[in-house]
């Protein structure tokens, strides 16, 4: 009943606003009509220059526009919520262990690959490559940043993991990434970090019996490692899985501390909210302000890139060209199937969450044309420093990205969610100028951006 009352009140408010807008000529038919978007932006459709009433300055904003700008500010980013599936996610001891593991190349058979190999702190936790490349072998996708992803519900470009800790595990056994095995990783961590591990998780299992716990065993494609894994008892596989999950939870505890920093845009948003024209003009050029206006106006960028992290966290097909020699990537349509089958998902036995807390997984949409070729919407903070772009690294710079959005070619297969921007060169340049104002280094304790003192 309370929901019905709230809904009724909301509907009444909407009707009152609509009547007011119609009566003032802001909406309705004919030449005097305008869309709700035009009310917010002062513009008249895609491709046209955003205008200010009476020739006002570039920094003149309506109350509604100031509200939109404020909604994008990092000041509106809520405190990081706990991860119910990771009971040690905010433990200082887990952060310290995860910090060590993140930079430890011992978590690869040849000692050449660590998490930081691809997620490099001095590159905003990316690697600057078109495709992630390990041991001179390309992976199928571009390396995304981990900055601020603790706020996400889904991980990887296709969302095939539903927690940071589950995501941290997959590369450990991927042949073209770390390339290790579950038993080898468990044995390595319990050997090198025994006291640190037990400080977080309590007594560790005894893995010294090599008949029960083979040196190389895992549910992977390698036939020898797979056969060894299958031959283990269910209880012993469970013991290994528990240690393996705890490795991921430690790395996730570290990653949760890597958050986006305050940018020039955020200072501008504060000035806009205060309607401080002098301060706004000090912070943004007219071109940058025009780019901001295009971003939430004619560009409709906030349809997907909204909120303080500039992402809705969802998945969309944007009709990217298929690189020569590559196969079509199913994206989210395959990722949904993988996450529901993942032994380390929120509903699994290695999760610390109650079933009720796993809302996203319980109500996941696993079928639909809109999932075909759809990939996670990346956040845009510090976007100028994270080229190349898109899940396959196909665009070398922001100019190339905007050109693609300007034309918005149809997707095949699947359905593209884009509508052509049809921006002029000046508008494209203004939009890019705005995106550059989002640049800012990660916000994290300085010591977490470097390998732990004394590590190899």
Language-model features: where?
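Periplasmic c-type cytochrome electron-transfer domains
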Residues: 2-456
């Amino acid at each position: 009943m309370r929901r019905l009352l709230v809904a009724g009140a909301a509907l009444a408010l909407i009707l009152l606003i609509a009547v007011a807008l119609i009566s003032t000529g802001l909406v309705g038919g004919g030449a005097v009509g305008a869309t709700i978007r035009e009310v917010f932006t002062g513009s008249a459709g895609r491709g046209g220059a955003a205008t200010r009433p009476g020739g006002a300055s570039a920094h003149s904003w309506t109350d509604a526009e100031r509200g939109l700008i404020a909604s994008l500010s990092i000041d509106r980013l809520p405190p990081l919520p706990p991860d119910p599936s990771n009971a040690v996610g905010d433990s200082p001891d887990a952060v310290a262990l995860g910090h060590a593991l993140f930079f430890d190349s011992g978590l690869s058979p040849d000692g050449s690959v660590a998490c930081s190999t691809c997620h490099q702190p001095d590159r905003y936790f990316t690697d600057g490559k078109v495709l992630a490349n390990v041991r001179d072998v390309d992976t199928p996708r571009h390396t995304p940043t981990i900055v601020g992803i603790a706020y996400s519900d889904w991980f990887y470009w296709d969302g095939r993991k539903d927690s940071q800790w589950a995501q941290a595990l997959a590369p450990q056994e991927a042949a073209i990434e770390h390339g290790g095995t579950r038993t080898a990783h468990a044995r390595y961590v319990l050997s090198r970090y025994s006291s640190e591990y037990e400080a977080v998780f309590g007594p560790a299992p005894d893995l010294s019996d090599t008949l029960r716990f083979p040196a190389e065993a895992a549910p992977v494609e390698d036939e020898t490692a797979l056969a060894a894994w299958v031959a283990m008892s269910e209880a012993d596989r469970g013991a290994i899985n528990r240690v393996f999950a705890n490795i991921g939870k430690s790395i996730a505890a570290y990653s949760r501390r890597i958050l986006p920093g305050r940018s020039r845009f955020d200072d501008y948003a504060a000035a806009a909210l205060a309607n401080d024209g002098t301060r706004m003009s000090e912070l943004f050029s007219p071109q940058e302000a025009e780019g901001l206006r295009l971003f939430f106006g004619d560009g409709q960028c906030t349809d997907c890139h909204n909120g303080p992290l500039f992402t809705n966290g969802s998945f969309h097909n944007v009709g990217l060209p298929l690189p020569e020699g590559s196969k079509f990537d199913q994206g989210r349509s395959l990722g949904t199937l993988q996450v529901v089958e993942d032994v380390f998902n929120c509903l699994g036995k290695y999760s610390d969450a109650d079933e009720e807390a796993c809302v996203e997984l319980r109500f996941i949409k696993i079928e639909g044309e809109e999932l075909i070729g759809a990939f996670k919407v990346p956040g845009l903070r510090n976007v100028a420093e994270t080229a190349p772009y898109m899940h396959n690294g196909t665009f070398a710079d922001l100019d190339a990205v905007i050109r693609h959005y300007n034309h918005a070619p149809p997707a095949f297969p699947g359905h593209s969610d884009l509508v052509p921007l049809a921006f002029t060169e000046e508008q494209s340049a203004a939009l890019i100028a705005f995106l550059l104002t989002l640049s800012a280094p990660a916000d994290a304790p300085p010591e977490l951006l470097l390998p732990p003192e004394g590590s190899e």
